[in-house]
């Protein structure tokens, strides 16, 4: 702004008066006042200069601009420095990351070596495991038996964990060589599963080495387990380790590895990734692994597929473990094949069991990888070309899965089974949360989960043992699963292909092929891996889920162990091998993978076969998972691409392929499995889901996982029992938690597929939007499609379980003893698994459907869950996601509501998955919660809605809402999907309802005594306040320092409490439309508290972390709560008024209250207004909930402003309503509705009738929504920096006021929000303000006459809205009795209260106050540019109203100027800016602006020799208006205040004029609405003028001026509506209202003020009024006399002059009227500085009048001292008239014969000036305010010219600049007035005084002073040229007079003319 100000303002200055600014720079003749500073030699000039270093306005302006520019430059420099520092920090971080990557790469290298050794060991282990697998398959042939055996195997594994670990170290070295050997053998013998695995491991040497290195680092790692376990197991362990390590590395270094991966080999990055994981960078590792995977998959799609298959296999293994029951059935079918594969895989798993135990947390996810690796190994054999990479990936991934399995086994054994399940569910949710953090993590999440597992494996070496035990069990389990799950595995693996399951797999795979291929196209390498993973996950759907969850786990994206546990527990229940969480998942997966184990090779072979279809899909899946892993950078990009492309290419299928492929095959397979292996596959799916849940649980606190595990176990048992019942459902549920989401949306055919699609979408979407957001949307999408699908119920249960688990986790169940549970689960769960296949089902089975019910409740409970979760979230990684998400959400929260409504639906429509990511920012937790809710509440709906349209849109929609409501809206959203229109109004209430449900009545009763059926508003408010106290009590429990999240939780709980209270109350006694009232209340509560929760003030408080932060924050919150209560009370009053307000107060009481409020205290009025405002706001919020949710964003405010503009009538009505209320509160209370209906029938306002109220509320909401929004808590940006860019004028005013008054912005935004609600349409408000500003009588008149007119309709409400709430803050500044003299642009704020006080009618005074507030809002919007208000607030007159005569420091003035310039540039119109500038100047003057301070003399005495001061009245980019005023003390601040008021008004009036013109054009319409108020104002003006004439206006002036301002505001408002009509109408109105003037005379004080405002806003009207008054009063001569008298009486000769001028103008044209108005305005100002010659200062606004006043004052306050005054008055009038040439002429003639003579002379220069003035005036009425300014300027110019023609010219130039928008007539008039003999005399006098002010403009050429011109010289030239017309004769005369050469005079005149023209052009 500063820069702009400089450019704009400086340019404006230059353009306006180029010479002056270029004083020394421009040596050309245009340097009019170049020597002004030096030239000022007079002591007077010196004195003036003393106040302003020089009289050169331009210098001041330039100085100010320079200061502003410098400040801006300094700020920018600081910002630049900060940015540079940030760059340095980022570069430092980058270098650190690079170093880390290098280290990781090195570590990966060493890990590769270790892995090769492990591979060797693994071969041995594989052999051993193969044998064991065969044995296990035999045992697995029977489920219960298998489970027991598996559990025993697990126990064995756990027992052999240490031996395995020992072996691990031993075999590690062997493995290295083996790895090398294996690579080729595997490649050569892809059929050999061992070799395949070894080969995959070898090919994944990086992964293997990573795993090995991890294992090495964790000497206890599964390497030993692998070795000890079996050669195969060791080999598997190597692979698993490598896979796990790779996953970990990928997880930890994935992001880093993205870059490294692109530059480095997969192995190297993975080594680095492994190192990173070892270093504890699971996320990075996951990412790098994703990259590595993507690269590997890129290099070899088959390998990628194999890897993916492996991942899927491991995921599937988990699922298989869960699905063991079914899998066993299937495995019986494919037992032989699967036994072989399963043996290999089981050997891997045996290796992995120790790893899994170690990695159990991670391994739940990694197991799929391990299995997948096994699959990949097989696939690698099948696909020798790609085996190396695939094997690498496979081995590494497998290692990860193995490791993860081991860890997960341990975790599950500890009770992680339930945790595993919960983790799995959470994994789908929290994983989505974390994946939200790591957008890639949803798909890659699986891979990452495995990767996380390795990371965890590092942390959990013991899990290796458990994993080993689990693997042993898994081997047996897998044997069984091979027996039972072979078909299932065939679906997912080659063996699956053998069976119909294989067909299903192929079916899914083809789908994957479709989607994944396109995904592969998007990122072939990544897609290859993802495709492999997805394809494998197709074979291993559960595994795919597990892969995601594993991935998440690897990335620490996994949900807390609680979630994992449930999955694991379910796995243990379902699978004998499940007992160890990892082992269970793995065992299951292995069972399924038993079949999968065989299938992996088969699956991978299948993949190879289906590879043509699936390779790319697999790759896509791998790519997706890899992308997710590497998503940090690439994820967002690639995954978005994948998602988008997949969406575009594959559409739903592709999305499934992309994200769902991992899980999609599973859904298809699961569906097929339902048919074939229904129970087994479902269990498999359950296993996968549980694995995912366990992974999710991992994300959550592990203890939570434990509890979740237990819960899940219970549910599992139930689920197992119900497993068969709802196998399909369970499968879907599992898919839903894990892959179902991914497949859900895209594989709509497969219910599970859509579910999977959702998951994938979640993963994909997360990458696109935000990790958490994306993931969460995906989850929601997932839930929606799942809802659509059968999984709906099952999925719902899963989410519910997840929620329950989450709750448990949150509650501290997360203290779960993973290890203990693992051990216990290994034993107990295994046992349970055998007997409880159904209980395992709970995850997938009817128990889950029950969970669905629970989920539905959970959705209700989710709010609590959210709160508790959030409370505990800090401990969860999810929390961080949630935090970041919520931060993002914060920023977008309000927009989100809107977005929810529109964008959300749209985005959902576009890409439920993709756009969810992009369109929504959501914390994972929110997403998961939202998903749960969606699953719960939206499931039916979503199933109908989401599934049909893929429900992605609906899902996204819900996602958005979830995000917005932190997941609470998730439920809401589904509901809203169905009732989207309802969502905006109901979403919050529905949310609230859920919250209320969550917050039971009993819980509320514990907090406060509930009166469920309150009989009075007071009872309701009392309960609300008690709740507020409870909130405070909770808040005060915080320590001095607490986190933002804690605060958010407090606020969220407060929202919940309040909304719950509102929901539980039966308000039927109070209100008829209870639901509407409750909705309104809830919406207001939510919107307000959300704003409290998320706004810049709170953020800054937390950022600053001050010692008193807690106190300050609560102060803010308390204020907001008070504001909220007021708002709620208003809503209640509104709703209760129609019903039983008598319960609280009778209607009469209300009316009394209103009256009291308006009359007795601003506070009361404020309260009432606030109530009304709140009512309106509530209504508004109902209709504009979305907007409100925008948190009054600046854009929203702008939009609201636009809305207000569009709804100008509404706003007007509001204003009028406010006005009416203010004028007649009782009447308004009674007639408000009538007024509303009458004045805004089309725009019903909140009224008495609630039914009516809703519509009215909508209209009012729209109208006041803007204002309300404008005054809502300022956005962070707004609060932090007073940017008016996006800030509405009202808000600017509010901010400015707050800053100046020191009132907290929060107060303003909070309490005053309602007040200022209507202030946004300041200009429109002006109409009602004008009416309001009219004295109470006039107001009543208006009310009575135009009761139906808008003025009264909203006046009280709106005024309260506008000023009452803000009034107090305003009153804080305005409370000081503001003298009209003090009235400043800034003072206007003050004046509003002062004026209100000043007015006899407190009511009108309050009205005035709002009006002034409006004016200030406008002006402040203009002047509130930036730092200056803060800088100068101490000097601001309204801050120091009493210091009227004290001079405002120049810096303050300059600050105002810069503000104005900035403000104008930013968002203020030129008119407003001009006003602001002038106002600033006047405010400076009023507070004794620089030149006012110079003329310290309180009384203006006409001293021709006194120096004149040029005051910049207007400054803008284009131009600046300079008022040349006498420095004499006579220029009292009052003048400037009047000027300021006028200027401020002018700025408003300009719009107002337009409105007025329009009104006149549409006199009937506007007369009824606006015109009458305008007429009243005019009458008031006339009355004021008469009062001034008749009464001594001194007192009146003060009061009157304020009314004038208000009137003016009203007029301005009217004018805003009808700008063009103003002039004519004003004449008519004035004429029409002339008779009314007498009536208005009573209101004269306010009227007089109104004239000022009118002058500015409705100059014509004011002129008309004056004209009327003049006509009524006397002839021109009489008028002049009267004017003189008035000036004396009022100490406002100016006012008299103005009136005189008006009288003259009455005969004159509208321009003349404008000029007259200016005079009147000046008169008000002048009345303040009566007879103060400083009319020059007023010149800009009312300076000319002031000059006259000065003379008059000097002569005496009595008009008779006028003789000179009269001449001056004539001059002034003429000057004003000269503003409009026509009127000028008329005036001249009317005034006197002498004036015409002089007029001719003056008119010549005036004509010159008129050129510019005409240009300014050319705008016509719209510029009438400027014209007034210009006229005033001209007057002061005339006076100045009297002082000195040169000075006059200067002043004229400035005036012309100021009156750019005014017509030249003003100048002519001023000149002609000066032309009068007295004018000549005064000119002579002035000529003397200019000496002081006559800083000679030194015209230099080549450094030589040729001519020096004083301002007096310029004035003289201009005056004479105006009078005599520019001619040689005139120039000669002037040359003699000025001792110059006629040519010089002529040249000077031309220069001045050029200046004026230039300013005109500007």
UniProtKB/Swiss-Prot annotation:
It comes from the Eukaryota. Its main location: cytoplasm. A motif (SUMO interaction motif 1 (SIM)) lies at residues 1716-1720. InterPro entries: FLASH (IPR039674), Gon4l/CASP8AP2_myb-like (IPR049257). The modification Phosphoserine is found at residues 20, 560, 798, 858, 923. Self-associates. Interacts with NPAT. Interacts with SRRT. Interacts (via SIM domains) with SUMO1 and SUMO2. Interacts with SP100; may negatively regulate CASP8AP2 export from the nucleus to the cytoplasm. Interacts with NCOA2 and NCOA3. Component of the death-inducing signaling complex (DISC) with CASP8, FADD and FAS. Interacts with TRAF2. This is CASP8-associated protein 2. It comes from Mus musculus (Mouse). The lineage of its organism: Eukaryota, Metazoa, Chordata, Craniata, Vertebrata.
């Amino acid at each position: 702004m500063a820069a702009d100000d400089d450019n704009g303002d400086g340019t404006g200055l230059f353009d306006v008066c180029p010479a002056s600014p270029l004083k020394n720079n421009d040596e050309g003749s245009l340097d009019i006042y170049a020597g002004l500073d030096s030239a000022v030699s007079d002591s007077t000039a010196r004195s003036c200069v003393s106040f302003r270093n020089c009289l050169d306005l331009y210098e001041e302006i330039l100085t100010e601009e320079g200061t502003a520019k410098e400040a801006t430059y300094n700020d920018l420099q600081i910002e630049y420095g900060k940015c540079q520092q940030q760059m340095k920090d980022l570069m430092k971080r980058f270098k650190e990351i690079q170093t880390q990557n290098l280290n990781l790469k090195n570590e990966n290298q060493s890990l590769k070596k270790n892995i090769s050794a492990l591979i060797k060991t693994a071969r041995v282990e594989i052999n051993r495991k193969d044998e064991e697998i065969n044995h296990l398959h035999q045992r697995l042939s029977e489920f219960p038996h298998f489970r027991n055996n598996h559990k025993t195997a697990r126990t064995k594994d756990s027992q052999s964990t240490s031996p395995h670990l020992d072996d691990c170290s031993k075999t590690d070295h062997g493995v290295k060589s083996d790895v090398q050997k294996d690579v080729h053998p595997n490649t050569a013998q892809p059929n050999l599963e061992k070799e395949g695995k070894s080969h995959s491991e070898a090919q994944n040497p990086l992964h293997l080495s990573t795993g090995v290195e991890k294992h090495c680092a964790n000497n206890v790692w599964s390497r030993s387990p692998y070795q000890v376990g079996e050669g195969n197991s060791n080999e598997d362990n190597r692979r698993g380790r490598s896979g796990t390590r790779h996953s970990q590395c990928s997880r930890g270094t994935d992001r880093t590895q993205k870059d490294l991966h692109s530059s480095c080999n997969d192995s190297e990055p993975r080594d680095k990734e492994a190192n990173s994981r070892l270093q504890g960078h699971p996320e990075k590792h996951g990412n790098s692994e994703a990259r590595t995977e993507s690269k590997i998959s890129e290099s070899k799609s088959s390998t990628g597929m194999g890897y993916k298959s492996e991942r899927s296999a491991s995921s599937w293994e988990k699922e298989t473990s869960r699905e063991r029951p079914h899998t066993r059935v299937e495995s019986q079918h494919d037992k032989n094949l699967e036994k072989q594969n399963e043996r290999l895989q089981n050997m891997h798993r045996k290796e992995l069991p120790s790893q899994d135990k170690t990695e159990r947390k991670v391994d739940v996810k990694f197991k799929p990888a391990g299995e997948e690796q096994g699959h990949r190994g097989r696939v690698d054999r099948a696909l020798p070309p790609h085996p190396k990479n695939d094997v690498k990936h496979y081995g590494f991934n497998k290692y990860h899965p193995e490791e993860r399995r081991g860890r997960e086994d341990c975790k599950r054994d500890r009770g992680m089974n339930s945790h595993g399940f919960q983790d799995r569910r959470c994994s789908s949710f929290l994983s989505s949360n974390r994946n939200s953090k790591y957008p890639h993590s949803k798909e890659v999440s699986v891979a990452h989960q495995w990767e996380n597992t390795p990371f965890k494996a590092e942390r959990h070496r013991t899990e290796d043992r458990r994993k080993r035990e689990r693997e042993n069990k898994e081997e047996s389990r897998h044997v069984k699963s091979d027996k039972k799950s072979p078909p299932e595995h065939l679906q997912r693996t080659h063996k699956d292909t053998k069976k119909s399951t294989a067909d299903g797999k192929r079916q899914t795979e083809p789908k994957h092929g479709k989607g994944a291929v396109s995904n592969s196209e998007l990122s072939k390498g990544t897609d290859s891996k993802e495709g492999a993973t997805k394809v494998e996950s197709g074979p291993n759907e559960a595994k795919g889920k597990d892969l995601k969850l594993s991935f998440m786990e690897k990335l620490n994206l996994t949900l807390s162990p609680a979630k994992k546990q449930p999955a694991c527990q379910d796995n243990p229940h379902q699978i004998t091998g499940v007992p160890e969480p990892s082992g269970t998942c793995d065992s299951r997966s292995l069972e399924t993978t038993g079949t999968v184990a065989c299938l992996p090779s088969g699956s991978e072979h299948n993949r190879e076969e289906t590879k043509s279809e699936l390779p790319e899909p697999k790759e896509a899946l791998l790519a997706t998972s890899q992308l997710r892993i590497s998503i940090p950078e690439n994820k967002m990009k690639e995954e978005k691409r994948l998602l988008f492309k997949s969406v575009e290419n594959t559409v739903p299928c592709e999305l499934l392929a992309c994200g769902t492929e991992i899980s999609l095959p599973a859904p298809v397979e699961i569906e097929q499995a339902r048919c074939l292996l229904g129970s087994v596959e479902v269990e498999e799916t359950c296993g996968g889901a549980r694995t995912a849940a366990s992974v999710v649980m991992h994300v959550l606190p592990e203890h939570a996982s434990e509890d979740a595990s237990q819960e899940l176990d219970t549910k599992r048992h139930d689920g197992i029992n119900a497993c068969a019942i709802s196998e399909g459902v369970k499968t879907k549920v599992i898919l839903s938690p894990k892959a179902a989401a991914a497949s859900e949306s895209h594989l709509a055919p497969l219910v599970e597929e859509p579910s999977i699609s959702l998951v994938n979408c979640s993963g994909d979407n997360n990458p696109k939007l935000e990790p958490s957001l994306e993931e969460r949307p995906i989850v929601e999408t997932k839930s929606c499609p799942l809802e659509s699908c059968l999984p709906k119920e099952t999925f719902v249960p899963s989410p519910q379980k997840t929620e329950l688990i989450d709750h448990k986790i949150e509650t501290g169940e997360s203290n779960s003893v993973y290890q203990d549970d693992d051990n216990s689960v290994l034993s107990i769960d295994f046992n349970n698994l055998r007997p409880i296949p159904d209980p395992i089902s709970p995850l997938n089975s009817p128990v889950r459907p029950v969970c669905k019910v629970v989920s539905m409740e959970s959705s209700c409970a989710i709010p609590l869950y959210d709160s508790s979760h959030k409370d505990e979230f800090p401990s969860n990684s999810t929390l961080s996601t949630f935090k970041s998400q919520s931060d993002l959400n914060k920023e977008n929260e309000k927009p989100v509501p809107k977005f929810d409504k529109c964008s959300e639906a749209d985005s959902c429509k576009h890409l439920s998955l993709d756009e969810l990511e992009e369109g929504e920012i959501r914390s994972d937790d929110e997403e998961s919660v939202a998903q749960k809710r969606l699953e719960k509440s939206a499931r039916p709906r979503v199933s109908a809605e989401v599934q049909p349209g893929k429900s992605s849109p609906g899902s996204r929609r819900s996602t958005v809402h979830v995000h917005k409501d932190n997941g609470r809206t998730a439920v809401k959203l589904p509901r809203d999907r169905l009732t989207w229109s309802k969502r905006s109004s109901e979403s919050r209430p529905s949310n609230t309802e859920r919250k209320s449900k969550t917050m039971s009545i009993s819980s509320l009763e514990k907090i406060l005594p509930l009166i469920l059926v309150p009989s009075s508003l007071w009872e309701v408010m009392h309960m609300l306040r008690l709740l507020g106290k409870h909130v405070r009590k909770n808040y005060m429990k915080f320590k001095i320092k607490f986190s933002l999240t804690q605060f958010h939780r407090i606020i969220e709980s407060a929202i919940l409490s309040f909304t719950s209270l509102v929901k539980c109350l039966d308000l039927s006694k109070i209100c008829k439309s209870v639901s509407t009232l409750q909705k309104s209340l809830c919406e207001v509560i939510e919107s307000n508290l959300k704003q409290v929760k998320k706004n810049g003030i709170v953020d800054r408080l937390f950022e600053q972390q001050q010692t008193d932060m807690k106190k300050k924050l609560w102060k803010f919150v308390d204020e907001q709560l008070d504001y909220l209560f007021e708002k709620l009370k208003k809503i209640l009053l509104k709703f209760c008024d129609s019903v039983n307000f008598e319960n609280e107060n009778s209607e009469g009481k209300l009316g009394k209250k209103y009256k009291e409020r308006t009359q007795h205290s601003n506070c009361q009025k404020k309260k009432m207004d606030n109530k009304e405002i709140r009512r309106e706001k509530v209504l508004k919020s109902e209709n504009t909930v979305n907007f409100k949710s925008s948190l009054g964003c600046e854009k929203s405010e702008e939009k609201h402003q636009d809305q207000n503009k569009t709804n100008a009538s509404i706003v007007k009505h509001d204003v009028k309503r406010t006005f009416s209320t203010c004028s007649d509160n009782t009447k308004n209370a009674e007639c408000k509705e009538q007024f509303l209906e009458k004045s805004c029938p089309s725009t019903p306002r909140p009224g008495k009738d609630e039914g009516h109220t809703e519509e009215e509320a909508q209209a009012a909401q729209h109208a006041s929504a803007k204002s309300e929004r404008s005054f809502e808590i300022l956005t962070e940006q707004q609060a932090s920096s007073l940017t008016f860019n996006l800030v509405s004028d009202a808000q600017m005013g509010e901010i400015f006021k707050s800053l100046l008054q020191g009132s907290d912005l929060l107060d303003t935004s909070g309490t005053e929000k309602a007040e200022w609600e209507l202030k946004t349409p300041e200009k429109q408000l002006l109409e009602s303000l004008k009416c309001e500003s009219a004295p109470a009588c006039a107001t009543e008149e208006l009310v009575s006459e135009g009761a139906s007119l808008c003025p009264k309709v909203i006046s009280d409400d709106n005024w309260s809205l506008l000023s009452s709430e803000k009034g107090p803050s305003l009153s804080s500044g305005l409370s000081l009795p503001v003298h009209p003299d003090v009235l400043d642009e800034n003072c206007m704020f003050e004046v509003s209260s002062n004026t209100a006080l000043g007015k006899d009618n407190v009511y009108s005074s309050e009205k005035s106050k709002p009006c002034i507030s409006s004016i200030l809002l406008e002006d402040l919007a203009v002047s509130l540019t930036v730092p200056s208000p803060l800088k100068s607030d101490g000097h601001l007159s309204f801050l120091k109203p009493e210091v009227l005569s004290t001079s405002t420091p120049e810096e303050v003035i300059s600050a105002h100027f810069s503000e104005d310039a900035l403000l104008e540039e930013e968002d203020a119109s030129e008119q407003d800016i001009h006003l602001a500038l002038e106002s600033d100047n006047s405010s400076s003057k009023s507070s004794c602006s620089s030149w006012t301070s110079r003329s310290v003399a309180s009384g203006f005495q006409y001293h021709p020799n006194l120096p004149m001061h040029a005051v910049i009245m207007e400054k803008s980019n284009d131009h600046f208006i300079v008022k040349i005023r006498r420095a004499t003390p006579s220029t009292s601040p009052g003048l400037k205040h009047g000027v300021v008021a006028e200027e401020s008004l002018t700025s408003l009036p300009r719009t107002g004029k337009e409105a007025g013109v329009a009104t006149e054009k549409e006199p009937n319409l506007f007369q009824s609405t606006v015109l009458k108020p305008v007429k009243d104002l005019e009458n008031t003006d006339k009355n004021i003028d008469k009062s001034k004439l008749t009464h001594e206006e001194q007192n009146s002036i003060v009061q009157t001026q304020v009314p004038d301002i208000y009137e003016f505001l009203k007029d301005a408002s009217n004018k805003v509506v009808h700008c063009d009509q103003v002039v004519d109408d004003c004449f008519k109105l004035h004429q029409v209202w002339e008779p009314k003037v007498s009536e208005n005379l009573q209101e004269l004080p306010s009227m007089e003020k109104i004239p000022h405002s009118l002058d500015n806003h409705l100059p014509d009207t004011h002129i008309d009024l004056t004209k009327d008054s003049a006509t009524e009063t006397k002839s021109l001569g009489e008028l002049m006399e009267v004017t003189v008298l008035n000036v004396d009486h009022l100490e406002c000769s100016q006012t008299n002059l103005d009136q005189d001028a008006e009288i003259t103008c009455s005969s004159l044209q509208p321009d003349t009227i404008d000029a007259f108005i200016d005079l009147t305005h000046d008169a008000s100002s002048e009345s303040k500085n009566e007879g103060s010659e400083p009319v020059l200062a007023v010149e800009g606004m009312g300076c000319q009048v002031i000059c006259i006043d000065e003379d008059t004052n000097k002569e005496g306050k009595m008009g008779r001292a006028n003789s000179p005054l009269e001449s001056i008055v004539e001059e002034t009038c003429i000057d004003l008239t000269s503003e409009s040439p026509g009127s000028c002429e008329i005036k001249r003639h009317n005034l006197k014969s002498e004036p015409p003579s002089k007029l001719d002379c003056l008119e010549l220069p005036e004509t010159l000036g008129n050129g510019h003035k005409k240009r300014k005036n050319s705008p016509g009425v719209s510029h009438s305010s400027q014209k007034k300014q210009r006229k005033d300027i001209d007057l002061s110019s005339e006076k100045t010219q009297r002082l000195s023609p040169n000075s006059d010219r200067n002043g004229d130039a400035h005036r012309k600049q100021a009156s750019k928008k005014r017509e030249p007539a003003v100048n002519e008039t001023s000149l002609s007035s000066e032309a009068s003999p007295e004018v000549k005399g005064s000119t002579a006098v002035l000529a003397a005084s200019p000496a002081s002010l006559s800083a000679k403009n030194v015209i230099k050429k080549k450094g030589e002073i040729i001519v020096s011109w004083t301002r007096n010289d310029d004035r003289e030239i201009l005056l004479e040229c105006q009078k005599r017309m520019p001619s040689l004769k005139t120039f000669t005369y002037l040359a003699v007079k000025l001792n110059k050469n006629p040519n010089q005079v002529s040249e000077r005149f031309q220069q001045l003319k050029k200046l004026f023209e230039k300013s005109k052009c500007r």
